[in-house]
């Protein structure tokens, strides 16, 4: 695809973190550490058509000096490419080495296993690796002139399958959200996605719930914490009233500051639309 542009690119790169001396070419990407994944994240966007998506599985290193598990990933993506990473699992160097040595049946002979294990750990130590993240890396062509999206989630629970439509819908929602200011966003009407339920956790004897959250039954099966105000807002999202109208009603009912609530609700609504909890009525 060097000189081509695509609407969809799917990849599962050979991303085991091996040293140059390793003989397992079927799983070795030919780059030290996570360099192959870095090159793909940096360059795949150049091969995507407008609204094009690249989907791949990959591993990445988390170094001791990193501020978060996705610090290095953030630095890889160019400004014209949206990057969404879903971390499904995280392993220490010891856990990672043990996994791949068992995959190669290197644990059958103790002396060789110790040598190979030490080689893995020395290689990780040379780059001050504290963990290895594993999961999905999703890239999307950022519309011209728009700010790119950076989304990083750690979701280790079981996800619904297939996810293709949910991924497409999420990037479409990002494009839709980028076109609207907070004020314009709250002039829209919304409906709650069909797989979303509302949960209330109450301590026996207490009048009010101690926790409230929205839960997705499908796609990525996320949860989203709710305040009293947000729960009130979502409960009225039936596609009839605009977000602005709902907020005005909540302000009157709870005697709140309207400007402050508009700002807080707009931030939450952006996240709820991006994650698929709320759907703009026209979509």
Task: Show which residues each predicted segment covers.
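A general structural signal for short secondary-structure junctions and capping/turn motifs
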Residues: 26, 46, 75-77, 126-131
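SAM-dependent methyltransferase catalytic-core segment centered on the flexible catalytic loop
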Residues: 10-48
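Flexible loop/turn segments at secondary-structure boundaries
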Residues: 12-18, 62-65, 92-95, 146
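Conserved Class I SAM-dependent methyltransferase catalytic core
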Residues: 32-87
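Single conserved hydrophobic/aromatic residue that forms the stacking wall/gate
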Residues: 1-11
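Rossmann-like AdoMet/SAM-dependent catalytic core
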Residues: 80-232
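Short secondary-structure boundary/capping segments
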Residues: 21-24, 69-73, 100-102
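Long, charge-rich, low-complexity alpha-helical segments
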Residues: 139, 219-283
């Amino acid at each position: 695809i060097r000189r081509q542009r695509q609407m969809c690119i799917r990849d599962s790169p050979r991303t085991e973190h091996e040293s140059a001396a390793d003989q397992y070419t079927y799983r070795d990407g030919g780059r030290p550490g996570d360099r192959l994944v870095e090159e793909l994240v940096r360059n795949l966007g150049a091969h995507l058509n407008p609204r094009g998506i690249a989907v791949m599985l990959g591993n990445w290193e988390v170094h001791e000096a990193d501020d978060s598990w996705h610090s290095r990933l953030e630095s890889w993506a160019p400004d014209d490419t949206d990057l969404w990473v879903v971390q499904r699992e995280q392993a220490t160097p010891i856990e990672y080495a043990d996994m791949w040595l068992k995959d190669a049946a290197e644990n059958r002979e103790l002396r060789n296993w110790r040598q190979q294990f030490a080689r893995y750990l020395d290689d990780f130590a040379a780059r001050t690796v504290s963990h290895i993240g594993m999961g999905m890396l999703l890239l999307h062509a950022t519309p011209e002139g728009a700010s790119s999206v950076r989304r990083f989630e750690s979701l280790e629970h079981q996800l619904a399958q297939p996810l293709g439509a949910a991924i497409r819908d999420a990037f479409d929602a990002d494009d839709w959200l980028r076109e609207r200011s907070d004020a314009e966003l709250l002039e829209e009407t919304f409906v709650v996605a069909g797989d979303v339920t509302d949960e209330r956790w109450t301590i026996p004897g207490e009048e009010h719930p101690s926790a409230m959250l929205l839960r997705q039954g499908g796609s990525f099966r996320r949860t989203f914490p709710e305040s009293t105000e947000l729960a009130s807002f979502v409960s009225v999202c039936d596609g009839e009233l605009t977000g602005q109208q709902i907020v005005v009603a909540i302000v009157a009912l709870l005697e709140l500051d309207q400007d402050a609530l508009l700002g807080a609700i707009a931030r939450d609504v952006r996240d709820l639309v991006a994650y698929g909890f709320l759907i703009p009525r026209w979509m």
